[in-house]
Design a protein with these regions (language model features):
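A residue-level signal for conserved active-site and pocket-lining positions in enzyme catalytic cores
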Residues: 1, 24, 109
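Conserved small/polar residues in nucleotide/adenosyl-binding loops
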Residues: 1, 181-188
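Hydrophobic alpha-helical membrane-embedded segments
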Residues: 2-8, 72-99
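Divalent-cation-assisted or electrostatically stabilized phosphate/pyrophosphate-binding catalytic cores
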Residues: 11-28, 179-183
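Multi-pass membrane catalytic core of lipid/isoprenoid biosynthesis enzymes
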Residues: 26-58, 115, 129-142, 147, ...
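Long, highly hydrophobic alpha-helical transmembrane signal-anchor segments
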Residues: 42-87, 158-161, 165-174, 178-179
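Polar-ligand-bearing catalytic/cofactor-coordination segments
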Residues: 85-142, 146-158, 168-178
Length: 193
């Protein structure tokens, strides 16, 4: 991942997880009452369905690929292990911020850090830009490198993709609403940070 990153032309599991989260959220909102208890139950259902589904689909695909040829199973698992990590993107974006700060290009540094943080960067001074970048790199290293690597080591691509599903739920809807309170809590449980 550090050498190649995630090529734009290659389908990425997180994109499909995101689509599944959006579809499941809509489906579950229609099926559960619009009360705090109903939304928590829907959140619990989503927090169970997506990670378990990601794990089972990956495990089944690798198993079926192995029936065709063991090398095919190895290649598929290798591809998904690669896609579960986010080393190059994190490195590239953080170095862009560093370069702009070294050039004393504060507007450029603000713009660069805005690509990796989820907050307003327009009023940050140089120290604020550096702090935002450091905080984001620390969190994203945990979410994009350390935790996925941990789960890949103990459970291969299926468990690595299960973790990515949990993390993607948290990123998309974990802080947005009551429905995904459970997804936010699920993201905090498997982290190794």
């Amino acid at each position: 991942d550090l050498c190649l990153g995630d090529p734009d032309w290659m389908p990425h599991p997180v994109i499909y997880m995101g689509k599944a989260i959006s579809a499941l959220e809509k489906f579950l909102r229609r099926r559960f009452p619009d009360t705090q208890k109903g939304l928590l139950m829907a959140g619990a259902a989503l927090a169970a369905i997506l990670p378990l589904g990601s794990f089972l689909m990956a495990a089944a695909a690798i198993y079926l690929a192995g029936l065709v040829h063991p090398v095919l199973a190895f290649l598929l698992e290798t591809l998904w292990c690669w896609q579960a990590l986010a080393v190059k993107g994190l490195y590239t974006e953080s170095m862009r911020v560093k370069k702009k700060l070294e050039e004393q290009d504060l507007p450029g540094a603000r713009s660069a850090v805005a690509r990796i943080v989820g907050r307003d960067t327009q009023n940050l001074d140089a120290a604020g830009v550096a702090k935002a970048a450091i905080e984001t790199v620390a969190e994203n290293f945990s979410d994009g490198v350390a935790a996925p690597l941990f789960y890949l080591v103990i459970g291969g691509a299926p468990l690595g993709l299960c973790y990515k599903a949990i993390n993607t739920m948290d990123s998309m809807v974990g802080y947005k609403n009551c429905l995904l309170y459970t997804s936010d809590a699920a993201d905090d449980t498997p982290c190794v940070d």
